[in-house]
Amino acid sequence: MAVAVSSSWSGSSSLMTPHTITVSGLPVHVYGLPALTVPATSSAGLAVVFVLHGRTESHEHPSIMGIVNRVVESARERRLAPDGKGAKDLLVVTFDQRNHGHRTVDRDRNLGWMEGGRKRAQVRKDKGMQAHELDNVSHATDMLACQVGTSRDVSFLIDFLPPALFPHDERTVTDWYSVGFSLGGHATWLALAHEPRITLGIPIVGSPSTHTLLTNRAANLPAPAGPLPLSAPYFPRTLMSLFDALDPDRTTRDRWTGKKICVLSGADDHLVDYYKGGSDKFVEKLREWGVEVDAWVQPNTGHACTPEMIERICDFIWRRGLSPEKGKL
């Protein structure tokens, strides 16, 4: 595997300027390197948090950059405070998910069964599409495939980012976290469930059950395009078996031991509803299992990551991840 390596230490760079490296053809953007303590004298731990973007977006989308910039800034401020001595350093990592950003192959395969909005309505009109025609027949398969692919990219980068980023063994990564918005929130749930090295996760308007989320969407797709049957070609048997094997809410208790999770949702989110998407029931189950879960459904909020959510993200990462005290919320 070819890994392109450039100098990882750039102390004169802006804290918000990404250091981009290529890991086996995947551009990876790393924020926070200038804030690291001196490698030769540092005994502090080092946490890396992946921030995963939403469907049809990219690593540069404003919703992601708002999270990235504030998380880097907040961690730096808190670590420099009097009570921050001994806290872990933090790096924030972004990359484009499969079929998104620079990895786009077929944009239509990122669409739902029926996309809303005036822009899409005009596209459908220009293409001569009929009211009953779907934008993307394979939406369910494409959604799960992208989510799982992203979670596996996270595992891949946990393996290969350290040698690419620190070729002279300047630092050792001690902790791995994941934060994700929408599609990235689904992928964060999957990373929590299937990657034991991810110990802290914050899914934002994400679902731990793609099966629950998508079957609800299919059943409620308005006529004349819907409702859709829960069978082929929309839900092939092979896809149903993947839901059984992969959906986080179908995994066993041992997968969640020691995990720290903060679930953020909008009360008026009609795309990934906290209840219809299965988050409420799974959060209850996790709490029954003794897993530390902080869940907040923000009133008067739709499918968005708000400034209030971003502050909760920063606070959770600090208190449950970076802080030398690790006090409970």
Tell me what each language-model feature is.
Residues S155-A223:
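Primarily recognizes the serine-hydrolase "nucleophile elbow" in alpha/beta-hydrolase
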Residues P34-S43, R70-D89, P162-R171, A245-R255, ...:
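Alpha-helix termini
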Residues G25-N110, Y274:
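Short, surface-exposed "cap/lid" segments of acyl-processing enzymes
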Residues L271, K276-L329:
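C-terminal catalytic histidine-bearing segment of alpha/beta-hydrolase fold enzymes
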Residues V38-S43, L200, T210-W289:
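The feature captures the conserved acid-bearing segment of alpha/beta-hydrolase catalytic domains
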